[in-house]
Design a protein with these regions (language model features):
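Transmembrane beta-barrel outer-membrane domains
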Residues: 1, 41-49, 61, 96-102, ...
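Outer-membrane beta-barrel proteins
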Residues: 1, 13, 22-30, 74-83, ...
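Outer-membrane beta-barrel signature, preferentially recognizing the C-terminal barrel domain
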Residues: 1-4, 98, 158-202
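Transmembrane beta-barrel wall of Gram-negative outer-membrane proteins
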Residues: 1-19, 60-66
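Residues on the lipid-exposed face of transmembrane beta-strands in outer-membrane beta-barrel proteins
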Residues: 2-6, 52-58, 105-111, 139-143, ...
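Transmembrane beta-strands of outer-membrane beta-barrel pores
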Residues: 8, 19-25, 72-78, 101-103, ...
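Membrane-embedded beta-barrel scaffold of Gram-negative outer-membrane proteins
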Residues: 10-28, 144-146, 150-154, 181-202
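Outer-membrane beta-barrel transmembrane domain signature of Gram-negative proteins
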Residues: 19-23, 28, 32-120
């Protein structure tokens, strides 16, 4: 991963670029007797990802903070299952080799009308392949109940949208090319606090 940061008094920008490699193995064997295992599944998955991301923050006084972020990923995935048995009872290799571009962009505005209260709104949109998600909004609120112990009340409501990954669609075994995106809403609320002694433990 390569990263770059640039800071000023009331704004900052940052960028990252990198490469991620993942390898998965899935084996399934059946005991056919006498301690002998017959492998029914012998699946291997190679996942290569190139990515770049950038983000920026801009403060207006002490009450407003605006942030923007964009992420671009290029995925290359290869999957093989060498234990598939065809109708003529011969083993054959089944799998897939696909690539997909994914883009995510978001903007956030945070307002602190008082020292204790913070309110923020986020708008996000994503692209996967040639498809675009609907606009995904989220709202967050937090209130500092007590400075002692940093006791905060937090709440949020957001729209959720999840599209299938390449492995969700094509992984052998278990991939399902008929999967469709999932959507919904989530609501959260709670209290957070911190214990410890500054400079000693937390």
């Amino acid at each position: 991963v390569l990263s770059w940061d640039h800071l000023r008094r009331n704004w900052k920008v940052a960028a990252k670029a990198g490469y991620i490699y993942s390898w998965f193995a899935y084996d399934y064997a059946n005991d056919v007797g006498n301690g002998k295992l017959e492998y029914m599944t012998n699946s291997r998955n190679w996942y290569h990802t190139l990515f770049v991301s950038g983000e920026g923050e801009y403060y207006i006084g002490r009450k407003w903070l605006f942030t923007a972020q964009a992420d671009l990923h290029q995925h290359f995935v290869t999957n093989n299952d060498r234990r598939i048995i065809s109708q003529d009872m011969n083993r054959k290799t089944v799998g897939y080799d696909h690539a997909r571009t994914e883009l995510s962009a978001s903007i956030t505005a945070k307002w602190m009308p008082t020292e204790r209260l913070g309110l923020s709104v986020t708008l996000r949109e994503e692209m996967y392949g040639a498809q675009w998600t609907p606009l995904i909004p989220a709202f967050y609120a937090d209130y500092l109940i007590s400075k002692r112990g940093t006791i905060r009340a937090k709440a949020s409501v957001s729209r959720n949208y999840r599209y299938p990954t390449l492995n969700d669609l094509y992984f052998q075994p278990g991939g399902n090319t008929d999967l469709v995106p999932e959507s919904g809403f989530s609501y959260d609320g709670g209290i957070s606090f911190a214990i410890g002694k500054e400079g000693v433990y937390s």
